[in-house]
Every structure is written in structure tokens, then in C-alpha cells.
């Protein structure tokens, strides 16, 4: 009679075979990811091809080091061991390593991270800072021994001597490189004497340049308050640091040129050009003022100053005549009133009435004289004030105070810019005039 095995015994036997089979200890398998749903820790999914499917397990530690995100339908190459799960009698592969089929893991990780950061807005143009036109100190984050720092120093020194270069020695590849780049970007931003940063390194493989594709480096450049120029690898190399930086330079020399957009020669030419423009503007202004002075000096007021106050003198004469006639009329009227009063009083027998009329006459006379005197004083004061204002414009009075008036060809001279060596001048003074010849002209500001 045949011995029947229990399901448990058969399963244990098969598991023992699986565990002891050297071919199942390390299996190289290609398949398409199926039934994948990302979990917080361990990942469970299927690998399939056109004819078969196998369950797959990836522990959390392996998944964390994967470097790219698993996606439904992605074809991958895995290394793992096949095991049998006794309770269900099913077998699966426990994946120890995986990479995309046909494309490197780093290349896939690059594309996935680029897609993620693009969606989050890290590379948008609106976040880019403008580079300053003039800098006094540039921070450089790179290896102290590479050609990058030498090229930057040489180019900056040639384009704008005097600009300082501050090197932040940084590990640019391998373990810990990304962390050093981030730390030095933050150190540079704590300084107040830097105008911008250049972050870069020489060329290399994608593995060599990978520190500049790390998300923490992208975030540090994005958060930098200092404008950042990225110069990573050769012209054909592109990293995520290039996308997030404010400007990307193909070479260290190009980065140095971007950092010093205006050379010292350009600046000096600009200063000279501005000086010339300012000088010409000043000359035009002086010429305009001189023409105004010349025109004013030839006006009627300066050639015949007495005509300035002729009209006022005539008005004063008219007012004086009017005042005198008014005073005469009022005196005549007062005399007539007095005669009438005297005649009336002569016919009166009352002494008190006479005295009262006499008092009224005396009061009226005083008021009249006071009013006439007040009007006369007021008109006289106005006349004297107008006369003083007009006489202050009289050149003869100005000369009388000790000043001199210089004429050239009967035209008033107001500035030494009107005079040249050999000119014949007339100097008018209070007691005569001098005819002189100019021996020398010196410009001095008073």
C-alpha cells in the first residue's frame, strides 16, 4: 500500500529543495512590474512576461537604496533568491538588487526627479534671480585642486582685476559630496560680502556628476539668496543643478564671464563717455546763460536805465499837482466858510454863540491840516520808496560805491569766458575810465 504524504510534508520537502538548490540561491531575472502599489515599507508586486508570472518581494532597506521609483509596467532586471512560502505553497523571488532594463538606474532616477521637480516649480523662470552687473567678491564652490578654480581665477583677473575670489573647498563626487555642496551653499549665504556664487566641477560620467543631481543640492540652490551660476561637467553634460541655477555656463571660463559681464575696460569707456556728455551739457548750459546775459545787457533798461523810472516820475508829478490843487480847493472852501461864519457872528448879539462858532472853525482847521499833512506824507513816502528802488538799478550809483564796469566793443562783460588774450577793454570807474589790453586770461571760480 502506497504511503500518502500530507500537504504539509510535501510543502516542507519542496521548501527544503528550494533552499538547498544553488541555482535558486541567486537568480538573475527579467520581468515586467505588475500589480505594484507603493507601500510605506516593504514592497509586494509581481514580475511577468508573456507566458508566466511570479510574485516578488522587496524589503524596505533594498527599496530605499533603489535610486529610482518602481512604476506599473516598468521592465526591470533583478537579482534575488527564490523561496517557497509554506502556508500557501506558493513561491516568490526576494529581490536583493534591481535596475531598469535598457537604461541605467541613475538615468531613470534623473528623469524621474527632473519630472517631479519640474511639477513642483523648481525650474520656472520666474524664480531666477538676475546676475549683478558689477561684483566685488565671488564665491566659488568646487574642488580646490581641479582646473575649475584656476580657469575662473584666470578669467576674472583678466576681465576685471580687483574682483576677489573666495573658494569654498568642496568634495564634488562620491559619498558625502552632495552634503558638502549643500553645506557650503548655506555657508556662503550667511556671508554679507559676496555678490554671487559659482557652483561647479569638471567633466565626468553620470556617476561622477551625480552629486549635482541630488534633490538636496537642487533645493539648496533654489533657496539661495545669492544668485547662482552652475558650471558642472562639459558643455554636453546637463545636471539638475543646471536647471535650477539662475544661469548655466558650459565651462568654468564661461561662468567667470557671466559673473563679470562688464569688463574693467568697458567700465572705463563708459565713465569717459559719461564725463564727455556731462562736459558738453555744461558747455551748452553756460552758452545759454551767456547768451541770456548778453541779450539782457543790450536791453533798453541797461542802455537807458533812466527810462525805467520815467513813467513813475511822471505819475508822481501828476499826483503832486493833484494833491496841491486839492489842498488849495479845501483851503479856499475853508476860508469861504470862515467868512460866512464871521459875517453871521457879526450880526449876532450873543457872545457865547460867537465863541462856539470860533471853536468849530478852529477844530475844522486842525482836522483839515492834519488830513492834508497825512496824505502828503503818505504820497511822499511812496515816491521815495519808488525812487530808491529805481536808483538801485542805476549803474552810475553802483560804480559810485567802488565797483567797476567792464565793456568790450561797447558791450558789457560778465564772464572771463567772453575775453581772450589781446582784447581791448574799457573799465569804467567812478572817477573816470581805463582803456586796457588783456595780457592773460585765468579762469577761477569765486
Curated annotation (Swiss-Prot):
Any single GO CC term annotated in Swiss-Prot or TrEMBL for this entry: exodeoxyribonuclease VII complex
UniProt keyword Mitochondrion, yes or no: no
The UniProt record lists the keyword Zinc: no
Gene Ontology BP annotations: DNA catabolic process
Alphabetized UniProt keyword annotations: Cytoplasm, Exonuclease, Hydrolase, Nuclease
Enzyme Commission code(s) on record: 3.1.11.6
Catalytic activities: Exonucleolytic cleavage in either 5'- to 3'- or 3'- to 5'-direction to yield nucleoside 5'-phosphates
Pfam families the record matches: Exonuc_VII_L, tRNA_anti_2
Predominant cellular place of this UniProt entry's protein: cytoplasm
Annotated compartments: Cytoplasm
UniProt-recorded Gene Ontology molecular function terms: exodeoxyribonuclease VII activity; nucleic acid binding
Classification via InterPro entries: Exonuc_VII_L (IPR003753), Exonuc_VII_lsu_C (IPR020579), OB-fold_nuc-bd_dom (IPR025824)
Annotated function: Bidirectionally degrades single-stranded DNA into large acid-insoluble oligonucleotides, which are then degraded further into small acid-soluble oligonucleotides.
Similarity section: Belongs to the XseA family.
HAMAP family, per the entry: Exonuc_7_L (MF_00378)
Quaternary state and interactors: Heterooligomer composed of large and small subunits.
Name of this chain's protein: Exodeoxyribonuclease 7 large subunit
Amino acid at each position: 500500500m502506497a504511503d500518502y504524504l500530507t500537504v504539509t510534508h510535501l510543502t516542507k520537502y519542496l521548501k527544503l529543495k528550494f533552499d538547498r538548490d544553488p541555482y535558486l540561491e541567486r537568480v538573475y531575472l527579467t520581468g515586467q512590474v505588475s500589480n505594484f502599489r507603493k507601500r510605506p515599507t516593504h514592497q509586494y508586486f509581481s514580475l511577468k512576461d508573456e507566458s508566466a508570472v511570479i510574485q516578488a518581494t522587496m524589503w524596505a532597506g533594498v527599496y530605499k537604496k533603489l535610486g529610482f521609483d518602481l512604476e506599473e509596467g516598468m521592465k526591470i532586471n533583478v537579482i534575488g533568491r527564490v523561496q517557497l512560502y509554506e502556508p500557501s505553497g506558493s513561491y516568490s523571488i526576494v529581490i536583493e538588487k534591481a535596475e531598469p532594463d535598457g537604461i541605467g538606474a541613475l538615468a531613470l532616477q534623473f528623469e524621474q526627479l527632473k519630472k517631479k521637480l519640474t511639477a513642483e516649480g523648481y525650474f520656472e523662470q520666474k524664480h531666477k534671480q538676475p546676475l549683478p552687473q558689477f561684483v566685488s567678491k565671488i564665491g566659488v564652490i568646487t574642488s580646490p585642486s581641479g582646473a575649475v578654480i584656476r580657469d575662473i581665477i584666470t578669467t576674472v583677473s583678466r576681465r576685471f582685476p580687483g574682483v576677489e575670489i573666495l573658494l569654498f573647498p568642496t568634495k564634488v563626487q562620491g559619498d558625502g559630496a552632495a552634503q558638502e555642496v549643500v553645506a557650503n551653499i548655506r555657508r556662503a549665504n550667511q556671508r554679507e560680502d559676496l555678490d554671487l556664487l559659482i557652483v561647479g566641477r569638471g567633466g565626468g560620467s553620470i556617476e561622477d556628476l551625480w552629486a549635482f543631481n541630488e534633490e538636496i543640492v537642487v533645493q539648496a540652490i533654489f533657496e539661495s539668496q545669492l544668485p547662482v551660476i552652475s558650471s558642472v561637467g562639459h558643455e554636453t553634460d546637463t545636471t539638475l543643478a543646471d536647471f535650477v541655477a539662475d544661469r548655466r555656463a558650459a565651462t568654468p571660463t564661461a561662468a567667470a564671464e557671466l559673473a563679470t559681464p562688464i569688463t574693467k575696460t568697458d567700465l572705463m569707456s563708459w565713465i569717459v563717455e559719461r564725463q564727455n556728455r556731462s562736459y558738453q551739457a555744461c558747455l551748452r548750459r553756460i552758452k545759454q546763460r551767456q547768451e541770456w546775459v548778453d541779450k539782457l545787457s543790450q536791453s533798453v533798461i541797461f542802455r537807458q536805465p533812466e527810462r525805467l523810472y520815467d513813467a513813475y516820475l511822471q505819475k508822481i508829478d501828476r499826483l503832486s499837482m493833484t494833491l496841491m490843487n486839492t489842498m488849495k480847493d479845501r483851503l479856499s472852501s475853508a476860508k469861504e466858510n470862515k467868512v460866512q461864519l464871521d459875517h453871521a457872528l457879526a450880526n449876532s448879539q450873543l457872545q457865547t454863540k460867537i465863541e462856539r462858532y470860533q471853536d468849530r472853525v478852529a477844530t475844522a482847521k486842525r482836522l483839515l491840516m492834519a488830513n492834508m499833512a497825512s496824505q502828503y506824507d503818505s504820497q511822499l513816502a511812496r515816491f521815495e520808496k519808488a525812487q530808491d528802488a529805481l536808483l538801485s538799478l542805476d549803474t552810475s550809483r553802483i560804480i559810485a560805491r567802488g565797483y567797476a564796469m567792464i565793456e568790450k566793443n561797447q558791450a558789457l562783460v560778465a564772464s572771463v569766458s567772453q575775453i581772450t588774450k589781446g582784447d581791448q577793454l574799457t573799465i569804467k570807474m567812478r572817477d573816470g575810465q581805463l582803456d586796457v589790453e588783456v595780457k592773460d586770461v585765468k579762469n577761477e571760480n569765486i
